[in-house]
Each structure stands twice: as C-alpha cells, then as structure tokens.
Amino acid sequence: MLQRSESGFKDIESMQDSNADKPSRTWTSSLRSLLGLVMVAMLIVVSATLVGLDYRRARSAAIAGAEDNMDAFVGRLVDRLGALSGDTSALVSLVASVANSFLVPPPERMNDKVAVLREGIARSPHIDGVYVGYPSGAFFHVVDLDSAAWRMALDAPRGAAIAVRSMERNDQGKPFDRILFLDASGLQFAERHAASNGFDPRTRPWYRAAVNGKAPVAIGPYEMATTGNLGMTISQAHRGNPQIVIGADVVLDTITDFLSRERLTDDSVSFVLDAVGRPIIHSDSTMMRRIMASKGRDRPVATPQEDGLIESIRRNPPPAGKATLVEVGNRTYLVTVAPLESALLLSGHRVVVAAPLDELLAAANETLVQGLAVSGAVVVVAVLLALVLAHLITKSLNQLTDSANRLQDLDFATPIDVSSHVAEISTLNGAMNRARDAIFTFALYVPKELVRKGIESGHFGGRAAWRQEVTAMFTDIYDFTTISEGRSPEEVVAMLSEYFDLFSEVVAAHDGTIIQFHGDSVFAMWNAPVADTRHAEHACRCALAVEERLEAFNSAQRASGLPEFRTRFGIHTGTAVVGSVGAKERLQYTAMGDTVNVASRLEGMNKDYGTSVLASGAVVAQCKDMVKFRPLGTAKAKGRSTALDIYEVVGVVRAVNTTEAGTAA
C-alpha cells in the first residue's frame, strides 16, 4: 500500500530523514570499541558532572564575592563623597548662615573675612579655595597656596601660605584686583595690585545656581581654570542677603585616587557617569587624561568614543544595584551600576564598577583545569582497562566481522553461527542473521546491485512509494524478433547475457540502476534509489557509452557470424512514483507514471526519425551545457495529449573521467 501525503505519496526527503534516524550497524561491528566507548562515556559523564558542579560552585562563589566587593567599593566611595560634601557644605553653610563680615563687600572687614575662610581651608585640605560673590560684582577669594599651580598663577612669594584675592574699585571708580599674601601664621607680608581681568562673579554658574536660594547646590565636575584639577563647587546664598553667594571649590583628587587604587583585579575599572551617561571620573589614568583634555572649565566632559565599555553601558544601561554581564568585543565584564544620591557632590550621577569575568574566574578556571586533568587521567586508565577486558572477549568478534564482510558482498551461502557467552555478541549475532535474512529476501526479487543501492540509500522498507524526480531510459534491440526466430534459444540467451552484462557495467559506471530486463529491453533509472544531482547528464552519457561499447560487441558478433544488436534508446526526465510494490512475498522496486511511459515512447520514436538515442526537452534543460543535442522539432508521444520537444543525443561537450561522471554507489 502506498503511503500517501497531501501530494499523494510520501516525499523522498521525509523518507530519507526517517531512515537517517535509524541506528547505524557500525555500532555492532566492534565490541572492543563499543565497550571502551561506553566506559569512557560513563566516566566522562560522571567526571564532567562532578567537575562541572565544582566549577559552578567556584564560579558562583567568585561572582558573589565580586558583587560583595563591588557593593563595598561603592559604599566606601559614597562615604568619601559624603565626607567631602559634608565638610565643604558645612563651611559654606556656616558662612552663609551668620550675619557677619561677609554681608559687606571688600575691602570692608577684610581681616574678619580672611580669618574665617583661612580657618576653614586649614581644616579642609580638599578645598581649593573659598570665595564670595556680591550683587555689585565685587569678589572675595581665599586660596590655599599648597597648590603649585596657584603659586605659579599668582607668582606667590616664598613663604606665602594663603592668598587673598579681592576685586575692588579705586577712588576713580575703576575696578582693580588686590592680592594679599599671608604666611602660615596668618600674617600679611606682601600685597600686589593688578588691573582687572573683567571677571564678573554674577555670570558664573555657581553664583546663578545659588542666588536667591536657600539650600546649598553643587556645580560640576569641571576642570579648574587655574590648577587644571578636577573639581566641583558647592555654593549657597547668604541668609542675610540672598544675592550674596558663598562658594567653595572642592578638589576631587581623593576620589580619582580612590578609584585608581581600589581595583578588584588588574584590568578592572571604575568610573562615574553624569546624568546623560558621560564619564567624568575614571580609574584609568590614560582615560582620565583624555577626559580632562576633552573638557573645559564649567563644561561637562565629552565621551571618549573609543572606550567600548562606556559606550556599551551608555547604549544599554544595566539595572542599578544588580550585577550584570556585559559583552565588550571578545571580553565579558561583570558590571555593577549604583546611583550616587546620598551626597551633595555628584548627586544624580552613577558609579560604574566593571571587572573582567575571566580575571574574576581565574581561580575557578584553575580548579576546572585541575579537575579536567584528573578526570582525563582516570579516563585514560579506564580506556586501557576496557581494552584489556575487550581483548579477552573478542574471540568471536572476528568471526562476526568476517560474516559482516560477506553480507556486504551479498554472500548468503555461508551461515552466520557464532556462539558466545557474552550477551552483546550473542545479540549482535542474532541481529546479523536477521539482517542476512532481510537482504536475502530483497535479492529474491531484485538484482543484487539494486539491493545494495537500496539498502545504502535506506529506501527499502516494505511496500512504500514516493514521488521523486528521476531520469528514465528505455532500450530495445532493433528487429530482435527476427533475430530470435533465426537462432536457437541457447544462442539467444548467450547473446543476451553478454549484451546485458555490457549494459550492467556501463549503467553502474554512470551511477544508474537497472530496474528491469524485459525480453531484449532494458529499463534503467537515475536519481533513485541513490540521489544523483546530475542524473539527466549521466543517463545521456550512459547511452553514448553503451553505443560505443556496442561497436566492439557487434564487431565480435560479426566475426563470429552472429547478428548485430542495433539498440534504440529513449530518455526522459520527470516526476515518477518510485518504490517497492507487489505482494508480501514478492516485491518489485520500480518506477511508474508518465515519465516512464514517455521514455518508452521515445525509444519507439527512433524508428520514425532514423535515430538511435532520443531525449526529451526536460532532459535537455538539465544538461544542455554538458551534452550535445540536435533538435528534431516536436511530436506527440502515444498516449499523451501534449507534444514533446524531441532531441537526438549526438555527443558530449567535453570528456570526463569516471569520477566526474558521477559518485560511485
């Protein structure tokens, strides 16, 4: 019974897929290999499971430890920022909350102003300077001269510890800058006047952000104009006059030093991103220099585009407070992102800590390598033991191997009778006997070569058929009836046997399969049961090769006084129903359908055209670049309503060797 699908028959691809799932008999060919494979597989599974579990534990522990360290790192950074913020904002708030000398612009009550700010700077070494901006444009600034940049900018005399800058007006109302230099004890020992540089505190971001407000605000980070250091400003309006703004510059060197010093691994990095994802502080000194070089005073930094990690985090921000794996190039990083909210400085920014996963897992990987080495040694020992054990029980295996080789040659005369106390060998013996019986059954109704190809392709599975594109070739001997009438049956059989031997050799050499010998006719087919992408070409080449061989055959016939066998060929390509049909006890592998009928009709049409090899347009369409054809027009084959394009096969475009002619079965 044909197995039907939506198109009527099972598709050839589905048949091949189902047969691909069947276990290969090569597993039964070597007990030694099978025994060794089973033992090795068991040991590998057990060892891999144990090593894998140990590695997973070590990996999880390493990642968990890294996450804890990252959280602790972020906590310490927040504490440092909190200390800087608290210390600075406390000084600014103190000055802004008391109705004191800062309510009047310089030069009034200069000593009181200097005393307060000098004391504040002395207590806060991270403060670069403290200043006051007035609504009139007056400005008062106390600078710590521990900074070499400030000493150079102000040309400070030796022994100066504090510089006091003030913007005042002379008697004519013209602005000028006064700079006072104080020693470490607070005594003034030098004074210098300079023309005003046009600085107006009222235009500065720190003044505009705090004026008329109540709470302290933070500005930056930015590169300080004089020192070039990374800094921020905390400013607040004076409570006595909200148009007077007190500001303090905070140097963030302690933060940058902390980031560069506190590293989880050699290549781990940490950096701070602003609200729009631009880096402002980085633990890597090279990256920090690029960041500093790309920004100006009071202006945020531009992102260095060549840093893949920063760009990846900007494009796909990881969730805050949760460690995430981030792929950058061919390296994976464990990344933690935490918002900075508890401190005034850098509030609204994010700190990012990233460590290469391979460095975090270095210890776990070392443990894995050690485990694999031990497991490998165990496997090697087990393989040796398995080989020794298999050698003791493989006496019968060689006999089974010989029997398998005989089956491969379709030798069914020698029985397979191997006895063994090993269950696997006994099972294999039974399986081979069943295989022998199955192949022998096939040999009852199809030639051995067809059986061999059918078994190799997996198409012999009982009564089944499917649609398959094939190239069919039919042949017939001209005037064979007359030849038979003039010869004895023995002579006819002898001539036909030699003739069919010739056909079998040439068809097999061109990857074809002889489906049937019917009288003096031959029905051969390509692309079934073995797939052949060049089936049409191979069929044409086969017909030409048979004609060439027949010349020698007929010469021998003439020399022996026997008749020549003039053979006609018909070749057609198309879809046919291919499979095994018949009764349960007698199956026949064949092809049916219009394709087969057309090939048979083409063979007969040679008489009308005076040709020997005719092919259809479907054949020409597939191999016109490899085979030479002569068009003969169109004609209707018997039993068909539509006309066919008829061509004579006259030769090949180029000669090919046997390998080019097709793939051996």
Curated annotation (Swiss-Prot):
Gene Ontology BP, a term: cAMP biosynthetic process
Organism: Rhizobium meliloti (strain 1021) (Ensifer meliloti)
Protein localization: Cell membrane
Domain Guanylate cyclase stretches: 471-603
Molecular function as annotated in GO: adenylate cyclase activity; ATP binding; metal ion binding
Segments forming domain HAMP: 394-444
InterPro entries reported in the protein's UniProt record: A/G_cyclase, Adenylyl/Guanylyl_Cyclase_3/4, dCache_1, HAMP_dom, Nucleotide_cyclase, Sensor-like_sf
Official protein name in the record: Adenylate cyclase 1
Lineage, uppermost ranks: Bacteria, Pseudomonadati, Pseudomonadota, Alphaproteobacteria, Hyphomicrobiales
Key word Lyase present: yes
